Amino acid sequence: MLRILDITAPDINNGNGIRVTLWVAGCTHHCKGCHNQWTWKYDQGKIFNEHKDEIYSKLSDWLSRDYVEGLTFSGGDPLCQDIDGINSEMEIVEWVRKNFPTKNIWLFCGDYYNDLPENSIKKTLCNMCDVIVEGPYEEDKRDIAHCPFRGSTNQNILYINKK
């Protein structure tokens, strides 16, 4: 089940332009030096299926603004969710595509895109997004000065769908 920790906006740290960031609960990577350790636990936040109206209302309020470029999934890790959680994230992506077709969608994850099984639900979610920031944070490769939107040099920005 997907749990939402927070929705932050306006946000300029988690993708190009001014964005809305959806923070999901839960991560199994537990990267040493992680900036978002507060998001690791799965038993915190609002259960998406029980708070959909509230979550969609807040997202709509921000995504309807012309100056907001899109939505970012962060956390935690959007890919470190059970099947129900991934399905909920896919529902959110489909909702954004339907209601705000000009907005782009970024997703941060600790996995490498090419390591995901081709027909997996995780890869399907990634393919629904426009930009993936992939790879675990590696403290010994920290270089925030030269890695926009990333914390370490092993992380990559992949443009999956151009918007």
Per-segment meaning from a language model:
Residues M1, T102, M128-C129, N154:
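A generic structural signal for alpha->beta connector loops
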Residues L2-I7, I18, N36-L107, Y113-S120:
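Conserved Radical SAM active-site core
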Residues R3-H30:
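N-terminal pre-triad scaffold of radical SAM enzymes
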Residues N13, N114, K141:
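Flexible, glycine-rich phosphate/dinucleotide-binding loops
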Residues G85-V93, R97, R142-K163:
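P-loop/Walker A phosphate-binding loop and immediately adjacent motor/lid segment at beta-alpha junctions
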